[in-house]
C-alpha cells in the first residue's frame, strides 16, 4: 500500500475504533511526539483509539508519573504506566508501584552542573522535575557536553528524548520497565507492539514483537523500528494502528 493509498483510507478517531479487531496485541505507547502534535498538545484523534484499544494498553513515557497516570484516568483505562524512562512502573490491577534508579546521584549531577555555572533551564517552579522520583531532566537549551561528562563521572547517563535531557541510571529503560510490568500482569513482554518516536523508545522496540516509529522519529528510533509510518506525530500513531490492523487481518 502506498502512502497516498494509506492517507485516503486511514480512518481517524471514532471511525477507527469501529475497525479495531479483538486480536490486536497489547500495546506500549509513548506520549510526547507520538500521541501529541508538534505543539506538544494531545492529538484529539488518538483519544478514542487509546480508550477503545481491545487489549492491554501501557503508557510508556519519560515524563514523571502524574502525567501518564492522569492520561490513563482520563482515557478510562487501567493504570498501566512506565514513567521516567523506566524508573517508575505502575500496575493498577496488581496495586504495584516499583522504583528503579539513583535519584541521589541524579541530584548530585545537577548540583555539580550548577556549580560549573550552568542551569537546568527550567523556571523556579520547575514542574518538569517537581514530581520525579528516579531521575532528573534538564532543558535542551542547556549545554549537553558538560552534562554528559558530569553524569559519566557519577556513573549515570544522559538520554535525549527530543524534549529534554534525562539524567538517569544506565540500567534503567522503558524496555526493562515493560518486562517488569508484563511480569506483573503475567503477560509475555515480547507479545507487545510498541509505538514511539525517540531514542528512549529503542529499548521498548527491542523487547516488543512489533516496533513502529512515527514519521517524526529520530534516527535511533527509526533504526530500531520494524516500520516507520508515513505520517508524523498523532497522525503517525493512527497510521501505526492501521499497520497493526493489517498485520492481524
Listing of model-derived features with the role each one plays in the protein:
Residues 19-40, 205:
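Asp-based phosphoryl-transfer active-site loop
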Amino acid at each position: 500500500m502506498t502512502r497516498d493509498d494509506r492517507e485516503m483510507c486511514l480512518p481517524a478517531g471514532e471511525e477507527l475504533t469501529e475497525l479495531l479487531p479483538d486480536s490486536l496485541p497489547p500495546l506500549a505507547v509513548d506520549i510526547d511526539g507520538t500521541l501529541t502534535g508538534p505543539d506538544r498538545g494531545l492529538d484529539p484523534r488518538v483519544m478514542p483509539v487509546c480508550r477503545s484499544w481491545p487489549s492491554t494498553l501501557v503508557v510508556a513515557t519519560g515524563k514523571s508519573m502524574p502525567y501518564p497516570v492522569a492520561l490513563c484516568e482520563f482515557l478510562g483505562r487501567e493504570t498501566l504506566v512506565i514513567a521516567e524512562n523506566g524508573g517508575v512502573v505502575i500496575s493498577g490491577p496488581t496495586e504495584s508501584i516499583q522504583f528503579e534508579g539513583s535519584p541521589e546521584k541524579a541530584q548530585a549531577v545537577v548540583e555539580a552542573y550548577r556549580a560549573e555555572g550552568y542551569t537546568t533551564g527550567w523556571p523556579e517552579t520547575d514542574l518538569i522535575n517537581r514530581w520525579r522520583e528516579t531521575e532528573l531532566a534538564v532543558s535542551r537549551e542547556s549545554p549537553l557536553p558538560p552534562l554528559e561528562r558530569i553524569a559519566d563521572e557519577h556513573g549515570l547517563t544522559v538520554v535525549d528524548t527530543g524534549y529534554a535531557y534525562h539524567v538517569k541510571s544506565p540500567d534503567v529503560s522503558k524496555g526493562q520497565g515493560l518486562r517488569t510490568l508484563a511480569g506483573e500482569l503475567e503477560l509475555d513482554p515480547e507479545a507487545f507492539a510498541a509505538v514511539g518516536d525517540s531514542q528512549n523508545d529503542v529499548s521498548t522496540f527491542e523487547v516488543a514483537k512489533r516496533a513502529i516509529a512515527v514519521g517524526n522519529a529520530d534516527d535511533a528510533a527509526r533504526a530500531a523500528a520494524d516500520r516507520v509510518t508515513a505520517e508524523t506525530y498523532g497522525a503517525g500513531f493512527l497510521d501505526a494502528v492501521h499497520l497493526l490492523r493489517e498485520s492481524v487481518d
